[in-house]
Every structure is written in structure tokens, then in C-alpha cells.
Amino acid sequence: MNIDIVISADHIDEKRLINKTVIIIDILRATSVITTAINNGCKKVIPVLTVEEAKDIAKNSKEDIILGGERNALKIDGFNFSNSPLEYTKKYVEGKTVVLSTTNGTRAINNSFNAKTILISALINSKATAKAIDKLNEDLIIINSGTNGQFSIDDFICSGYLIDCLYNIRKDLELSDIAKTAHYIYTNNKDIESFVKKATHYSRLKSLNLEKDLEYCFQKDIIDVVPQYKDGYIIKLNI
């Protein structure tokens, strides 16, 4: 199995994704939100690029819609929820459709439509994702959503942890240089939050008093669900 990493949504080459399994990572916080919502019984998540598109879906849909997302880490005016996974509890999302628009994560998803399979991962479900990847048994591209088009330490080390989870299942992994680097960084910094504390995105969220979000997102493997993007929306993967 060949594994490569793309360092941000702006670095996605759509032609490279053809016939590949793609993993989208945005641990702070879009993929943590999506994974949490699906785990809590959300019917589906619709990732969109713009606020206007999200509001149009909510206006025209007959489904029970929750609008969620952020711009520059802040809740979007008129939306039900921000980009905090702690808001997407079973009480609020079970049986409902979440329309989500974020600065980085939903852009990475929408830039990956050429892939054969698109899975959603974060620290909170990395082992479950690794098991799914093993069953799919296809070459893999891990896409880091990044921060405003730039490299993001938090997504990168999460990629390294995901690779480590895969190594615990199978040894026939062929890593690109960047994938080797991510794995090396994780194996030498297994206390991920301590390593990430100086990162730009981490500092931004902490400055907004979002410590509880950070604490939640840096937990490993508390969820055994893998979301999959397919045909315009995200649902629970069944393989």
C-alpha cells in the first residue's frame, strides 16, 4: 500500500486523486465535528464552501437542518452552531442533517471529488480509520486541510498517528518522504497536544478560550465510527 500526504487544501492536485482512497484530516476542528456528529446519530453532513450555499440548502430543504460552521474560528452569523464538536451532541443532531461550512476542512473535502473513496478522520477516530483503510486495501492519499492554505502542524502529526495505527495492522506500507516525516514526528512526539501547543492554529483557538475544544480534539480513539463522503454528503461508512 502506497501512502502520500498533501499538506493543505490549496495543494490538492485533483488528477492525483483519481482511483485513490483519500483521507481528509482537519482535527481543529471540522473533521472532529463531522466524526462526532455522525457518531451521535446525525443523519448526514453536507459540506459546503459558502455561507450562502448553506443557507440556501436550509431554506429549500424539507429535512430538519442544522447549520454549522465558522469563519476564522468564529461562529457564522445566523447559524445554529459553530465549529465546536462539543455542540454536536446526540440531543441536538440525532436524525438531523448538518450543513457545514468551515474555513479549511469543507474546502479540502470539496477539492477531493475526483477520489474513488473519501473518508473523514481525526485523532478521535484514527484507529477506526486505519481498520477501514486496511479493508479497502487501496493506495492512500492523506489530505491535511491545513490553515488558510498553509501547512498545519496539528493535521500533519495526526497523519503520522494514522500511519502508526496502520503499521500496527500491516507492515506492507510504502511511504513517500513526507509520509515518513509525519510518522517520524509522531513516533517522537506521542504526546500530540504538547507538541502542537506552539502551532499557529492551536494558539488562535486558545486565544478564543476554546480550551475544552482542544482537549476534546486531542483525545485518541474515543470514537469507533468512520464518516464517508459520497454523492454529495457524509454518512457512516459501512464495509
Curated annotation (Swiss-Prot):
Cofactors: Mg(2+)
UniProt keyword list: Hydrolase, Magnesium
Signal peptide extent: none
Reactions it catalyzes: (2R)-O-phospho-3-sulfolactate + H2O = (2R)-3-sulfolactate + phosphate
Keyword Transit peptide assigned: no
GO MF: 2-phosphosulfolactate phosphatase activity; magnesium ion binding; sulfopyruvate decarboxylase activity
Keyword Hydrolase tagged: yes
Record-linked InterPro entries: ComB-like, ComB-like_sf
The protein's name: Probable 2-phosphosulfolactate phosphatase
Organism: Clostridium botulinum (strain 657 / Type Ba4)
Lineage, uppermost ranks: Bacteria, Bacillati, Bacillota, Clostridia, Eubacteriales
Gene that encodes it: comB
